[in-house]
Structures are given as structure tokens and as C-alpha cells.
A protein has these predicted regions:
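Hydrophobic helical h-region of N-terminal Sec-dependent signal peptides
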Residues: 10-15
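A residue-level marker of the well-folded mature domains of exported/periplasmic proteins
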Residues: 2-6, 22-363
Length: 363
């Protein structure tokens, strides 16, 4: 059972996101709001996404376009190029055009409460996609992979990978987190630290830089250049003679940036975690460099979102699997959570057997 209370305090201090409760509600028909009477099958649906910083966002764009078209909806898929004001304007335009549902992958989950309220007042259902929208009473649903579990899987993979290379510690590690304005970043980090902190406390893990708090390890904008710059500084300051055994990286883009930095310092590549199953990182895993990634199949996430849209169109409540954990600061948002899968070289063929692209990469 998760230590939700502790995590809630940490999240509230950073972004007012709290994970409350301690357990799951596995009902398929949760208490979401909105669209009780349904809407026309050819209604306008708005999809507001952040930016194409990773392959999963680009893939989501095409999957949404194809899925909405096949279902008969009028669609509008917009990227905000990671600009908060641009996304706010895009959502407002979707409201003006009469969107029945607006699916939002937030640039900054704490900056959309006014737009969400306007959507609600106009009769639209709001679904937070992948990233929870914070401090907004009118968010109807949240659909995502279980991001706390993602962090747990990453933390355990880091320990397993280092143990496989060197049976006993202590191990020298450095920690990276995602962008502070992404509500998921803190959840990933707290999930990982629920696994790693006991090992830090008992001396199994050593952090030479001393940088172990979320605020010290974030990577603005999830940008590779920011991660590489920090990794360069860490290598120069702390690992001119010492060996770095592992790096907790929250996604594949930052993982590859960290690896590039370590190689530039002419040091052995440590165990490095990741997420998103990007092609280049899967290749790196198969080549024995990056140790792990997380398979959060974007096709399944978009499919789950489309199923929710179809239910709402018919006047039914959308599928919900959790009604306790995701408190956005002002309400518990009914969530439809999917299960992430850890991937290493050992299980890559099985994990990607049904992926038309990655199944070829791992052969």
C-alpha cells in the first residue's frame, strides 16, 4: 500500500497536488460529471497538447486525429509549443467553437483553472490527459498511466541494474527529475524515492553532489540540453576520479542526454533509467547502454481516452478506475489509470511484441 499521506505533503508544498487515500477503487463507472444527456455523434472535440518534446506526444496527435475521424467527430488537435498563454488561448478558442469535450495535456497544470471553468460553464466536459490539471474544480476526468508506479519501477530498475553490475554497494548515484511545471514530475520523483530513500538512509546509495531534493534536481522544460549541462557540471565537480554507478532519469530524452555527458567525460556509462520507449533509447538499451525505459503505450492511452469520449457521447459516465488518489488541490478527480511496464534488454522483445515499430528495433 502506498505511503500516500507522506507524498501528499510533499506534493502540496511544491504544486498543491496531493495523492490522498490509500488504495484503489476498481469500479468501471466512476463519479465523473458532465454530459449526462450525451451529444451528437458528429460533435466538435478539442484536443490541446503541450509540445512535441518526445515521440509519445507526436504519436498522440496522429492517433487522436485518426480516432476522432473514424468515430465521426469533428476534431481539432493543437500543440501549444510549451507556451502557457498559447494553450490558454487555444482552449478558449475550442470553447468558442462549441467543443463538447476538451482533452488537455497541460503545459502547466497550475495555469488552466480559468479556462477549465469557462469550458464547464459552456457545457463542455474536461478530461486531463497524462498530466493532472491542478486547482481546478471543474476538471471532470483524468486519464493517464499510473505515474507513481512509473517512479517506483524506475527506482527499482536502478537498484536492480547496479546490483547486476556490482553485487554490493555502496553505489554512487545522481538524481534527475522532470520539469517543475509538469504535475507528473513530482509524482515520478516521489514514486522513485519511495524505493530509493531507504537505501540512501542506510548508506547503500551515495549522492556525491548532495542534490537529492526535488527542487534541486528538476530539468526545466524537460529539455535535453538542460539535463546535459547539469550532468556535465556533476561529472566535473564530483566524478573526476570517483565512479558513477547509476542515474535516475525520469524519461528517455534526459537519459540519453546524461549518457552523452558521461561519455564525453570519458567515463563508463552507468545504469540509467528512462521512460517513454523512444526508438533511440530502445536501440541504446539493446546496445547495452541505457539500462531501462518504461512502456507507456500511447496507443492504449489514446484508445482509453477515445472510449471515454464514446461513453460521454452516449450520455454515459466515462470509465474510472480510481476515485481516491488524485486530489488536484480542490477536488479528487476521477481517474482512469493504465498500468506501466518496465522494459530492459531482458524483456524488450516480449514488451514490444505488438508494437509495429519497436518490435523491429528489438530483433
Amino acid at each position: 500500500m502506498r505511503r500516500i499521506t507522506k507524498i501528499a505533503v510533499a506534493l502540496t508544498a511544491v504544486s498543491t497536488l496531493a495523492l490522498t487515500g490509500c488504495g484503489r477503487s476498481d469500479s468501471d463507472n466512476g463519479s465523473g460529471s458532465g454530459s449526462a444527456s450525451g451529444f451528437a455523434a458528429d460533435s466538435y472535440i478539442g484536443i490541446a497538447l503541450p509540445q512535441k518534446t518526445s515521440e509519445n506526444w507526436s504519436l498522440a496527435e496522429q492517433l487522436f486525429k485518426d480516432g476522432l475521424s473514424k468515430a465521426g467527430f469533428k476534431s481539432d488537435v493543437q500543440f501549444a509549443n510549451n507556451g502557457v498563454s498559447e494553450q490558454q488561448n487555444q482552449i478558449q478558442t475550442m470553447i468558442t467553437k462549441g467543443a463538447k469535450v476538451i482533452v488537455i495535456g497541460a503545459v502547466d497544470g497550475g495555469q488552466l483553472s480559468s479556462q477549465v471553468k469557462a469550458a464547464h460553464d459552456a457545457g463542455a466536459v474536461v478530461i486531463a490527459y497524462d498530466r493532472l490539471i491542478l486547482n481546478a474544480q471543474d476538471v471532470d476526468y483524468y486519464v493517464a498511466f499510473d505515474n507513481f508506479k512509473v517512479g517506483q519501477l524506475q527506482g527499482q530498475a536502478l537498484l536492480d541494474g547496479m546490483h547486476a553490475k556490482k553485487e554490493n554497494g555502496p553505489y554512487n548515484v545522481e538524481l534527475f527529475a522532470g520539469s517543475a511545471d509538469d504535475s507528473n514530475s513530482k509524482v515520478f520523483f516521489e514514486g522513485a524515492m519511495s524505493v530509493l530513500k531507504p537505501k540512501i538512509d542506510d548508506g547503500t546509495l551515495k549522492i556525491a553532489s548532495g542534490q537529492k531534493d526535488f527542487s534541486q534536481v528538476t530539468t526545466q522544460g524537460w529539455k535535453a540540453e538542460n539535463a546535459q549541462k547539469r550532468m556535465d557540471a556533476l561529472m566535473t565537480s564530483n566524478y573526476s576520479s570517483a565512479t558513477l554507478d547509476g542515474i535516475l532519469s525520469p524519461n528517455d530524452t534526459l537519459a540519453r542526454a546524461a549518457i552523452t555527458s558521461v561519455k564525453a567525460a570519458n567515463k563508463p556509462v552507468p545504469v540509467v533509467t528512462g521512460q517513454d520507449s523512444e526508438v533511440e533509447s530502445v536501440k541504446s538499451i539493446m546496445a547495452g547502454e541505457q539500462y531501462s525505459t518504461i512502456n507507456k503505450d500511447t496507443r492504449k492511452l489514446v484508445e482509453a481516452t477515445m472510449d471515454m469520449l464514446t461513453s460521454l457521447q452516449k450520455g454515459q459516465k466515462a470509465k474510472v478506475t480510481d476515485e481516491k488518489q488524485y486530489n488536484n488541490g480542490v477536488k479528487v478527480v476521477p481517474a482512469n489509470l493504465l498500468e506501466p511496464v518496465i522494459v530492459t534488454k531482458a524483456n524488450a522483445r516480449e514488451a514490444y511484441s505488438n508494437d509495429p515499430t519497436l518490435s523491429k528495433v528489438v530483433q
